[in-house]
């Protein structure tokens, strides 16, 4: 793509220079980017043109340019007649249509393929003006500038009696139209001090950057021709980059200690349709010389201050040049690509794709096939339980040694825990389970309890037993010394009794769970 853009850049420059579209469409600006804000845009339509037809168009264009050059030496004569080989009447009609279509043709070679590009011609009446017309145009332009300046000052008159503020770090600025522009330090906002407008701190120095001319003096000197100021002395209309704005230069500010002269400031009023009156920015260009930009919708009421509209780019169409033998292959290839587009459009993705990411696919970004793991908070309450051993109705069952090794459990330690549960159960049913919860794994022993043994259950603690043999002694020692009583988790799961007549004692029946922590 970059190579194609570099190849087409000379074509765009040639079109801009040859057609004269710049002068007729908008004001010329050296900062304009031909590629970012193009006056022309190149298209490659899905069409072709025969080689014979392309040669004919280029030849007719060359003859037409020669005829226009010879026309200056034969005034009063009609257009020069083409003296080449005899053509049919249909070809003559096509020739007249082509010459009157307002296009110029250029042959281009791009990546080994020939193209015929049609460039639209844009009329430029400014270059055909005589000297008298140019002088008249300059006079009209001066009158338009004076009119727009008067109109701009009239629109800004509505700002009289109003002030705007701008805060920039330590300094704050106030702009009061027809009065002055001041730089001061504002008091910090607090009780009794509003955040806006900023209140000047009287304990610090403030500076006047510029004062407006006294309107009363202008009225007193209105009849005096020597002191009467013209409109352009008060304000000036400037143009930059196709946009016009009003400029007022103010002096008479506070004396500068470094230069020994009064401070001065240039105020620019720009049209901004989607904004209220506000100070855009202010900066010190040179020592004690400032520039302030004000955006106001008031100037937008005059067409002279409206921002330039972006014109639509003229289309340059480049078609492939094919011979008659290549047409069949080109059409077959085109039908194949159209069929592929239909197939691809019919395939709907399983998950919506946003920025090349399948939303809801549970995949790591940039890593194929990996599932996004849930955080610790998201997995609270989720448990995986597997029965390791249990006693039910006097019969004891447990997992085989191979199954225990799958869970990383030592069969000898499981046998020790089973014996410990037998001692605690005292002939009752019990269950030994392995539980995975919150990213941790542990062994839970559950013993069925009766009402007569509730007090004994409350006094029992949890026995901590690791799964690996290296920490077995540690778990048994904690159980014997009773240190695990503080860390024990004990809960009673109440269940519905099987007896037909529910009683108070039956409702309190349950089971005791003893936790054996599995340190992995």
From Swiss-Prot:
Sequence motif Prevents secretion from ER, location on chain: 517-520
Gene Ontology biological process: endoplasmic reticulum unfolded protein response; retrograde protein transport, ER to cytosol
Pfam families reported in the protein's UniProt record: PRKCSH
Binding residues annotated for a mannooligosaccharide derivative, in chain numbering: 170-171, 183, 257, 263, 284, 290
UniProt-annotated location(s): Endoplasmic reticulum membrane
One GO location term (cellular component): endoplasmic reticulum lumen
Any GO molecular function: carbohydrate binding
InterPro entries for the chain: Man6P_isomerase_rcpt-bd_dom_sf (IPR009011), MRH_dom (IPR044865), OS-9-like (IPR045149), OS9-like_dom (IPR012913)
Disulphides: 163-176, 256-288, 271-300
Sequence segments annotated as region (Disordered): 121-144, 442-520
Entry keyword Membrane: yes
Membrane topology: Peripheral membrane protein
Keyword Transmembrane: no
Stretches assigned to the MRH domain: 161-302
Keyword terms: Disulfide bond, Endoplasmic reticulum, Lectin, Membrane, Signal
Biased composition (Basic and acidic residues): 473-499
Source species, domain of life: Eukaryota
Signal sequence, renumbered to the chain: 1-23
Residue ranges with Polar residues bias: 121-135, 461-471
Subunit structure: Interacts with missfolded ER lumenal proteins.
Role summary: Lectin involved in the quality control of the secretory pathway. As a member of the endoplasmic reticulum-associated degradation lumenal (ERAD-L) surveillance system, targets misfolded endoplasmic reticulum lumenal glycoproteins for degradation.
Family the UniProt entry places it in: Belongs to the OS-9 family.
Protein's name in the database: Protein OS-9 homolog
Source organism of this protein record: Aspergillus fumigatus (strain ATCC MYA-4609 / CBS 101355 / FGSC A1100 / Af293)
């Amino acid at each position: 793509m970059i190579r194609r853009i570099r190849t087409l850049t000379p074509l765009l420059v040639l079109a801009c220079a040859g057609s004269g579209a710049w002068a007729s469409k908008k004001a010329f600006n050296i900062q304009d980017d031909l590629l970012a804000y193009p006056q022309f845009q190149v298209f490659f339509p899905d069409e072709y043109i025969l080689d014979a037809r392309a040669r004919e168009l280029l030849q007719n264009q060359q003859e037409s340019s020669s005829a226009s050059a010879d026309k200056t030496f034969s005034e009063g004569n009609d257009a020069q007649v083409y003296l080449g080989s005899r053509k049919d009447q249909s070809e003559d009609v096509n020739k007249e249509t082509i010459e009157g279509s307002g296009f110029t043709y250029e042959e281009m070679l791009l990546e080994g393929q020939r193209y015929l590009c049609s460039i639209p011609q844009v009329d430029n009446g400014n270059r055909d003006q005589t000297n008298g017309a140019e002088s008249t145009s300059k006079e009209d332009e001066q009158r338009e500038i004076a009119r727009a300046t008067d109109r701009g000052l009239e629109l800004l008159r509505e700002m009289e009696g109003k002030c705007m503020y701008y805060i920039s770090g330590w300094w704050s600025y106030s702009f009061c139209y027809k009065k002055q522009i001041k730089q001061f330090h504002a008091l910090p906002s607090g009780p009794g001090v509003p955040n806006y407008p900023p209140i000047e701190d009287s304990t610090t120095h403030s500076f006047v950057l510029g004062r407006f001319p006294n309107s009363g003096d202008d009225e007193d000197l209105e009849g005096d021709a020597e002191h009467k100021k013209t409109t352009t002395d008060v304000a000036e209309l400037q143009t930059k980059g196709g946009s016009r704005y009003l400029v007022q230069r103010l002096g008479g500010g506070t004396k500068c200690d470094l230069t020994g002269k009064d401070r001065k400031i240039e105020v620019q009023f720009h049209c901004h349709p989607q904004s209220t009156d506000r100070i855009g920015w202010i900066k010190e260009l040179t020592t004690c010389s400032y520039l302030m930009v004000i955006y106001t919708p008031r100037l937008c009421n005059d067409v002279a201050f409206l921002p330039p509209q972006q014109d639509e780019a003229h289309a340059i169409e480049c078609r492939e040049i094919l011979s008659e033998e290549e047409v069949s292959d080109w059409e077959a290839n085109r039908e194949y690509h159209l069929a592929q587009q239909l197939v691809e459009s019919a395939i709907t993705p399983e998950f919506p794709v946003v920025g090349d990411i399948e939303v809801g696919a549970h995949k790591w970004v940039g890593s194929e096939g990996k599932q996004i793991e849930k955080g610790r908070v998201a997995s609270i309450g989720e448990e995986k339980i597997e029965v390791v051993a249990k006693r039910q109705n006097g019969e004891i069952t447990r997992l085989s040694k191979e199954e225990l090794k799958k869970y990383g459990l030592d069969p000898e330690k499981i046998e020790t825990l089973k014996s410990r549960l037998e001692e605690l159960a005292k002939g009752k049913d019990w269950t030994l389970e392995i539980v995975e919860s919150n990213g941790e794994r542990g062994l839970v022993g559950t013993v069925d309890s009766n009402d007569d043994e509730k007090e004994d259950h409350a006094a029992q603690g949890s026995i901590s037993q690791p799964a690996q043999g290296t920490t077995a002694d540690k778990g048994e020692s904690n159980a014997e010394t009773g240190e695990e009583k503080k860390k024990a988790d004990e809960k009673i799961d109440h269940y519905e009794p099987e007896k037909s007549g529910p009683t108070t004692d039956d409702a309190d029946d349950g089971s005791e769970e003893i936790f054996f922590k599995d340190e992995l």
